[in-house]
Amino acid sequence: MAKDVEGPDGFQTRDYEDPPPTPFFDAEELTKWSLYRAVIAEFVATLLFLYVTVLTVIGYKIQSDTKAGGVDCGGVGILGIAWAFGGMIFILVYCTAGISGGHINPAVTFGLFLARKVSLIRAVLYMVAQCLGAICGVGFVKAFQSSHYVNYGGGANFLADGYNTGTGLAAEIIGTFVLVYTVFSATDPKRNARDSHVPVLAPLPIGFAVFMVHLATIPITGTGINPARSFGAAVIFNKSKPWDDHWIFWVGPFIGATIAAFYHQFVLRASGSKSLGSFRSAANV
């Protein structure tokens, strides 16, 4: 909540007060169409995200497979894959931010839930929609390119040879921390009020964070940082290796999101103590 005031540098700025935290459990939300519209938006966005990105991964493997007539440097490469993931997040967050918040990732939803930005009901429904959307998105890839999908790994996440479990888990924790920390920073209403004279396009830094994390972690885990993305690919590909390593792509992102949420709320923002107090008061009701 803010009102326009004159800043010391002559810019128009805003006098700001933190909005109240979202109720922990809001049963009334279930009666509102806006909730279901947002859930549908999350489902469709995650479906499109997985469809385009998994197609990109498989296309790169086809074009770089020398046994199938490809060339060593064929296809988009790791850089192109990173652009595909980051670019799709930029596009989809831009399209859905005004409807659902543009989460497209259970780890992002979980982090925002911990910070009291979304209710428990909304968080659970979002995560279910994201996982179902991911399954459908990868399912479309397999339906349209069945032989290539099976032969080239199905875009599934697993720990690469030469890396131990600790390295893979750390990559997922740190990568998700970067993403969720960026989400909090880009969408911080206090920042928007303070820097109201600076046009900010929140999806841009979020998409760029995804791009940068993919460059760093594709060689290690194929880059999860999104449990729905890893889950959808594992369900449709359904091989032992992705399932054996699958826990990494839930535990790592959720730990990373938790650290990012608490760092932003309790270290960077003075509102952290208020959020903790609201959690305690909600538990005593």
UniProtKB/Swiss-Prot annotation:
Recorded superkingdom: Eukaryota
Induction behaviour: By dehydration. Not affected by water stress.
Ranges facing Cytoplasmic side: 2-37, 103-123, 187-199, 269-285
Region described as Disordered: spans on this chain: 1-21
Residue ranges, compositional bias (Basic and acidic residues): 1-17
Database matches in NCBIfam families: MIP
Protein name: Aquaporin PIP2-3
Upper lineage: Eukaryota, Viridiplantae, Streptophyta, Embryophyta, Tracheophyta
Gene symbol of the encoding locus: PIP2-3
